[in-house]
């Protein structure tokens, strides 16, 4: 029987550890503060922002939220980011994506100080990851590493296949697996023999953005499957990139959707906020 990797439980454990750490920091006069900026009122973005606020409140991290109107200009947003960069009370700055179409997302990400880039999206953070320097790691890939480690799954020497090459998941995921001594293959829409490559994987990370794309023909017996996808099926139920019911009996471990990778993203964001406060206080 395969191990169902419980992201809810593991993320809860991490939040408890952070709660204790924040309490000890407060006793030393060190506070942790996350500022979230949302432009417009996209309902999904509002849910994500609310979840971040709740996690902050639980752990003891102060959260500030700027809810800016849709018509906010690029210059106005950059001016706010510049002000927050200079505010020593603020440890982490996060602009909820996507931003409205009239804005330049790349310029916005680059405007955030790398010292406060708790999303891990700044080019300096990405460069630090590839060279092994200290920096903030994108939250979803960092969460996946924690899922594997805390489930007793070794990455060292394993054949790891990442399907998807996005800047948020695929690319940083491949770098993190490499850092853990995995032998990494990254696949994408131009990969010719996708099924054959996936069948070789000891650890398969599915981040292709297509519901139930991966069935049992893509995985070998005893593989570990990490499902990053999140979709709604025709019955309006959540599902991932992996057809869970077809794959579960063939693999040694798998993340469900929901309750797998998703909860880890916010837990690792909170971890990055605490890390930012420690660095700002030379700890």
Positions of the model-derived regions?
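Positively charged, low-complexity intrinsically disordered leader regions
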Residues: 1-30
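Glycine-rich phosphate/diphosphate-binding loop of Rossmann-like nucleotide-binding domains
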Residues: 41-53, 135-224, 237-248
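Short beta-strand elements in bilobed, periplasmic/extracellular small-molecule ligand-binding domains
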Residues: 56-70, 184-186
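Short, well-structured alpha-helical segments in soluble
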Residues: 76-88
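Anion-binding alpha/beta catalytic cores of soluble intermediary-metabolism enzymes, centered on
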Residues: 94-155
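Short glycine-/small-residue-rich Rossmann-like dinucleotide-binding loops
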Residues: 98, 208-210, 229-230
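Short glycine-rich, flexible loops that bind phosphorylated cofactors or substrates
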Residues: 101-102, 212-214, 233-234
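Rossmann-fold NAD(P)-binding glycine/threonine-rich loop
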Residues: 105-126, 226-280
């Amino acid at each position: 029987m395969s191990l169902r990797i419980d992201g809810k439980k593991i993320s809860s454990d991490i939040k408890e550890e952070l709660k204790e750490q924040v309490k000890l920091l407060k006793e030393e006069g060190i506070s942790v503060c996350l500022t979230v900026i949302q432009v417009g009122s996209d309902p999904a973005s509002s849910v994500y922002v609310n979840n971040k606020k709740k996690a902050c409140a639980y752990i003891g991290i102060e959260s500030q939220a700027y809810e800016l109107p849709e018509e906010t200009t690029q210059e106005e947003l950059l001016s706010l980011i510049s002000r927050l960069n200079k505010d020593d009370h603020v440890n982490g700055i996060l602009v909820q994506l996507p931003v409205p179409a009239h804005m330049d997302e790349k310029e916005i990400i680059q405007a955030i100080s790398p010292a406060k880039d708790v999303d891990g999206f700044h080019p300096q953070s990405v460069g630090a990851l590839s060279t092994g320097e200290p920096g903030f790691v994108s939250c979803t890939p960092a969460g996946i590493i924690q899922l594997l480690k805390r489930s007793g799954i070794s990455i060292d020497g394993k054949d790891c296949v990442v399907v998807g090459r996005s800047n948020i998941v695929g690319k940083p995921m491949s770098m993190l697996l490499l850092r853990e001594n995995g032998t990494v293959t990254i696949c994408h829409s131009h990969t010719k023999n996708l099924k054959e490559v996936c069948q070789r994987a000891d650890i398969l990370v599915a981040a292709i953005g297509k519901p139930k794309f991966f069935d049992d023909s893509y995985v070998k017996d005893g593989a570990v499957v990490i499902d990053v996808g999140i979709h709604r099926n025709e019955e309006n139920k959540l599902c991932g990139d992996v057809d869970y019911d077809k794959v579960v009996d063939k693999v040694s471990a798998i993340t469900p959707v929901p309750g797998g990778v998703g909860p880890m993203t916010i837990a690792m964001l909170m971890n990055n906020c605490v890390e930012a406060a420690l660095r700002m206080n030379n700890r």
